[in-house]
Amino acid sequence: MYFMTTILVIHAKPLTERKAYMEELLKDFTGKVDYILDADRDELTDEMLAEFFKPGCEVDKKSNAASCAIKHLLACRYIVEHDLEGALILEDDIELHDRFFEKFERSMQEYRQRYSHLPILISYEDSSLQFVPRSQRVKGQWLYESPLNRVRFTGAYYLNRAAAEAIWKDVQENKCDISVDHYQVKLYREGKIQILWCEPPLATQGSFTGRFSSSIGRIRKFEAIRWKLKYAYKRLLYWLR
């Protein structure tokens, strides 16, 4: 019924409650689901950091942020090595909005008609509170070009093979020197990939809503409440623009 892309889940093995959550979340999905398990924080080595990061950069240390970045880069390699058309990449705290796969399929129909010949990353999440202004939205359209100076995080995105190849090639030649979401936008600015936003967004990281504690930095309960209030404000603000 739906576009049967592979789903790759970015997962840290010690977070067993998140694995159980993702299995329940995706239990009705009939396509292939695989987990990116390598490069947990306690598995990082100096050699591994040197393979992916520029020496001395902000992520060149044995941290949760470095682990997360490497897992996303390994997802790119997975797409390339398995010769996939692309994959939907989800972090293990993601909350999918109502009728996610139905709406995802509609966005993919538009992707196939307009963008499949390009190296494409499609962001599906709203965790960064970045939206398409209402004045720019077109009825029946799901995908919009991302501004060059905005970051939508990496909780839920589709990456086609051409974009995965471009990212993996750049890592091999130039190394990553910033957090993975900013690295993706850096490659977008350089013209190596193109980033699209799905509007309306279809997913939110549970680390922001309070469902989970963040695996990178602690988000306290009051911060989750503040995020939800800010979310309502931002949705209204972008609707008025």
Residue ranges and their predicted role:
Residues 2-90, 94-241:
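An acidic/histidine-cluster motif and surrounding catalytic segment
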